[in-house]
Amino acid sequence: MRTELAELALALFVERGYEDTTVEDIAAAAGLSKRSFFRYFPSKEDVLFGDVEDLADRVADAVRARPAGEEPWAVLHAVLREWEARIHAAQWDMAALRLIESTPALRARLHQRRDGMRDRISTALRERPGTGLDTFTADLLTACAAAAIDAATREWLRHDGTDDRGELVDRAFTMLAPGP
């Protein structure tokens, strides 16, 4: 039901605008009460971001599972390249991404959720055996990786989804790769 409710909400947001769509509108369109809506999502914004924490945990687990001795930047590149399509396919198609980019409240929520995701990934990077990464370095690498994903996503949106997102991610990671 969460997935169906999220899809319905997105359709209403696109049709009416985010600000002009209420929780009552979403609930009514789904045949639910407002109270029932809140059993599935704590807020209107969370309809678009409901699975981010679970996804963040899975990405962090993938970081921990990478081969010992692999350079931290290579770990982030490999994991985020692999997960990039799943991260966006989870709930964010082009309509959702455009809605988020054009709605200040949703952009703020996205940044809040991304902060949590970056924290989980940074922690996972530090916890890898033999890395010896300090918090500052892990946070910096993770923030740069997030910037690479953001830039790749924006470029993909600028070209109406016709570019290969994986290639954009590779390009961004190559451009931001730490020097020797």
Where are these regions (language model features)?
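Basic, helix-initiating cap at the start of DNA-binding domains
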Residues: 1-16, 20-32, 54
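HTH DNA-binding helix-turn interface
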Residues: 15-18, 32, 38-50
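Hydrophobic alpha-helical connector segments
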Residues: 57-96, 102
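Secondary-structure edge/capping motif, primarily at the C-terminal ends of alpha-helices
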Residues: 87, 128, 152-160
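Hydrophobic alpha-helical bundle segments that form small-molecule/ligand-binding pockets
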Residues: 89, 103, 115-141
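Hydrophobic alpha-helical segments that form the core
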Residues: 100, 135-155, 167-176
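C-terminal peripheral helix-coil segments that are non-catalytic and often amphipathic
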Residues: 123, 161-180
